[in-house]
Structures are given as C-alpha cells and as structure tokens.
A protein has these predicted regions:
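Conserved N-terminal entry element of GNAT/NAT acetyltransferase domains
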Residues: 1-26, 161-166
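Short hydrophobic/aromatic beta-strand or adjacent loop that forms the aromatic wall/cage
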Residues: 62, 151-155
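Acetyl-CoA-dependent GNAT
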Residues: 22-26, 33-90, 95, 100, ...
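Conserved GNAT acetyl-CoA-binding A-motif
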Residues: 120-132
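Conserved acetyl-CoA-binding loop-helix of GNAT-fold acetyltransferases
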Residues: 105-118, 145
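Conserved active-site alpha-helix within GNAT-family acetyltransferase domains
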Residues: 110, 134-152
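Conserved beta-strand-loop-alpha-helix junction that forms the acyl-donor binding cleft
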Residues: 130-139, 157, 161
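Active-site acidic-Proline motif in GNAT/NAT acetyltransferases
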Residues: 100-102, 106, 135
Length: 166
C-alpha cells in the first residue's frame, strides 16, 4: 500500500459514499496521477499495461478494482489467481494496492482488499498472498490488521548491478 501526499479533497471520501468497482479505461489517467503522487514517478505505460492485463482479460482470475468517491479515484487494488508457481497450489496474489493518504483510516483499503478476496473466493482459491518490504511498517500494519501473517515461503534476491554481488 502506498500513500499520496495530496490528491484532491478528502471531503468526498469521508462524507460521500465510496464505491468499489472494476476498473474502466476512463479511470487509468486518475490512477496514473494517484500513483505519481504516491511514488514521485509517473508511469503511464506501466498503468496502461496493467489495465489491459488485469482489467480486460480473464476477468474470472484477474482483478483490478478502484475505490471511487464523487467521480474521483481514491484507491485501487490489483490481484490474480496464480497456479502452481513455486510448487504451490493455486492461490490469490495482491500485486498492488494504493489509497490516497487523505483517505487512510476510512476503510477504503480494507474494502478494496475484501473485494479482491471475494473475487478470489469465487475463483476457487482459499489463500491470498502478497510481497512487501520487511521495513515498510505502514503496509505491514495494514496487512496484519487484515489477518495476513508471515507465510512459510521466503524471498531471495541477487543484485545484478555488479558481477558476483549479493
């Protein structure tokens, strides 16, 4: 989960209703802007690619939801069912979740995650997983509050910037 520094009026998310729905092509520009506020990098090609991959194909196993308040995107989540990777039976994965910082603590991220979990259950899986940086306490706290805990798998990595570096 990432947070933005700004992004419009929080009034709409706090006082109006927030609707969780599948992403539409018209939402992508707002998602790009929201992500750029959170990360400091505009990644238009990346987000259009994510829309085409998760918002238009195999919608039974791929999910891209947005949280909308008064026609403004205040959050998003992307996930899918992955089959037999790393020798594991099919399970759901959360790839991205983001909520405007002024909409935190209003239940938006929880509602997005629950919408994804509902889709994953309907697709027949019984577990959901994600990856996050071990020192990202905000994200860790959110996922722990949602009942997620350390899994029995670990991530290994190798730095490819220099030959032989780890």
């Amino acid at each position: 989960m990432k947070a933005s520094a700004s992004g419009g009026s929080a009034k709409s998310a706090h006082q109006g209703s927030v609707n969780i729905r599948r992403v539409a092509a018209a939402d992508v520009a707002q998602i790009i802007a929201l992500d750029a506020e959170m990360t400091g990098v505009e990644k238009a090609d990346y987000w259009y690619s994510r829309f085409h991959e998760f918002g238009t194909r195999d919608l039974r196993n791929r999910f891209f939801f947005v949280a909308e308040a008064d026609r403004h995107i205040v959050g998003y989540i992307i996930g899918e069912v992955r089959d037999w990777e790393f020798g594991q039976p099919p399970c759901g994965w959360v790839f991205a979740i983001g909520v405007r910082s002024d909409c935190r603590l209003t239940g938006v991220a929880s509602r997005l995650l629950e919408a994804l979990c509902d889709g994953l259950r309907a697709a027949g899986v019984t577990k959901v997983r994600t990856l996050l940086a071990f020192d990202d306490l905000l994200v860790m706290s959110f996922y722990r509050s949602q009942g997620m805990m350390a899994a029995r798998m670990i991530t290994l990595e190798r730095n490819l910037d220099t030959e032989g570096a780890t």
